[in-house]
Amino acid sequence: EQRGWTVLLQAPPRKGIYGMANSKKKTIWVHPITEAMGIMPQTFVHEAVHAVQACKTGKMKPLGYKPALDYVVDRAVFNNLYRNYTSRKWAIEKEAFAIQAQPNRIPLIMGLIVEHCPIKPDEQAA
């Protein structure tokens, strides 16, 4: 939120999804049901990756971060991408899924936020 994004713990405007990031509205939604499902941290990190991907230009573009994934996770990510996303979104989604799958996902996303989304001097006073 320090970087101008709003984070909402409510159902995303699109049905059937657990999280959503809208770079035009600078808003992240995380569905409350993700807490009961035990996937809230992963969902939040995934959507936070999309916010970071949009920091510089306002449009989501891959950061170029390619963490190592074991074969099973890599195949699961690929199958999810193939079934649920258009090919033009694969790069940004693959990166978000890869980062959310890391055991150090929380410090990792915090570092990426600091690196790619610095607080502008005029925002620090707010």
Regions found by a protein language model. Give the residues of each.
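Metalloprotease/metallohydrolase-associated module, dominated by Zn2+-dependent proteases
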Residues: 1-15, 61-126
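Short pre-active-site segment immediately N-terminal to the catalytic Zn-binding motif
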Residues: 25-44
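Extracytoplasmic/secreted proteins, especially bacterial periplasmic and envelope-associated proteins
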Residues: 39, 43, 47, 91, ...
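OB-fold/S1-family RNA-binding modules
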Residues: 19
